[in-house]
Amino acid sequence: MENKILEIFIPGPAGRLEAKYFKSQKITSPIALVLQPHPQYGGTMNNKVVVDTFHAFMDNGFSVCRVNFRGVGKSDGEFDNGQGELADAAAALDWLERENFDN
């Protein structure tokens, strides 16, 4: 069965975070979290560099996730001058680790 890229929502400190997720079929695969460019300058998880990086990890056997920070796309909340966005990244990484390493 072929894995697919899933559109998901991750619980974040300011509400739901919109994300795309690919889970490798290999249970020992490494993980990667790809973050968007600065949201105040038009950065989203759909930025070409983000998408290309996501696919490069995916093509090399990683379980990989890309996330929109708070207030971007379908993510809840609003821009928080970097502090909230750092908390969003931490929440996404925690989720990614639980999804891939918890038994």
Task: Tell where the protein language model's regions lie, with residue ranges.
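Serine-hydrolase catalytic machinery in alpha/beta-hydrolase-like enzymes
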Residues: 16-101
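A domain-start/cap signature at the N-terminus of enzymes
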Residues: 1-8
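Short strand-coil-strand connectors
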Residues: 11-13
